[in-house]
């Protein structure tokens, strides 16, 4: 998972980053709240670890921006030296999902992050299974079948589809998709838009098939797997996509 760390103390930042890297996560450390805010308009993360007091824009302000502008399920963990009970209450009431006081205990930090991610992304750790609804993935042949028929996909369209199905519920920015699938973000974001449009059409990614691609204005997309209550019942009057 991609984790953003806001920590202006280099020693603490190294401990947090090392601990989470050892747990298999990708980390980006910010020592300045203003810089982090600027990057949040370009980058997507799956969890945030915030210190309280940092230069320019402090942790609670960052938390407020996250809650106002990003999907509500994104987990936020405060890791701070503020250990008064009132501080803990204030942080949780402001929208943090958990609160941990320094000094940092590596195993506890890993456990808290794992628990937050498990609650926020219950489907993400599950591999794509052959027979996901009407979508069947042949990972060896790099093919996807819809209702028993192999869909004609270009190589990059297949990679994009596989990435979406492996990351349900996550906000995927244009930059993130470009870096993961094209190896660089120095490409026009319309490349992603074009591929996504073609993929939605070819794979018929819509609620009637139990999935949907939700555009997140100015950022990117979120791929959602719907439960039975959210899936419309097909009728003979259903319109074509």
Question: How should each PLM-predicted stretch be described?
Answer:
Residues 45, 71, 118-122, 169, ...:
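Generic structural signal for secondary-structure transition and capping sites
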């Amino acid at each position: 998972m991609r984790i953003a760390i806001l920590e202006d103390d280099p020693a603490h930042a190294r401990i947090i980053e090392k601990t989470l890297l050892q747990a298999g996560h990708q980390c980006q450390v910010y020592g300045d709240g203003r810089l982090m805010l600027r990057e949040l308009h370009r980058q997507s993360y799956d969890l945030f670890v915030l210190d309280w007091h940092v230069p320019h824009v402090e942790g609670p302000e960052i938390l407020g921006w996250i809650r106002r502008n990003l999907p509500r399920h994104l987990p936020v963990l405060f890791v701070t030296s503020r250990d008064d009970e009132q501080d803990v209450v204030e942080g949780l009431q402001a929208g943090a999902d958990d609160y941990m006081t320094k000094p940092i205990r590596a195993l506890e930090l890993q456990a808290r992050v794992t628990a937050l991610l498990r609650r926020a992304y219950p489907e993400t750790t599950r591999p794509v299974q052959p027979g996901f609804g009407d979508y069947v993935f042949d990972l060896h042949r790099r093919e996807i079948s819809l209702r028993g028929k192999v869909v004609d996909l270009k190589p990059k369209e297949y990679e994009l589809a596989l990435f979406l199905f492996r990351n349900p519920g996550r906000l995927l920015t244009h930059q993130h998709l470009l870096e993961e699938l094209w190896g660089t973000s120095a490409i026009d974001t319309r490349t992603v838009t074009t591929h996504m449009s073609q993929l939605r059409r070819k794979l018929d990614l819509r609620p009637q098939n139990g999935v949907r691609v939700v555009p997140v204005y100015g950022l990117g997309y979120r791929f959602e797997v719907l439960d039975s209550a959210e899936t419309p019942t097909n009728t003979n009057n259903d319109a074509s996509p």
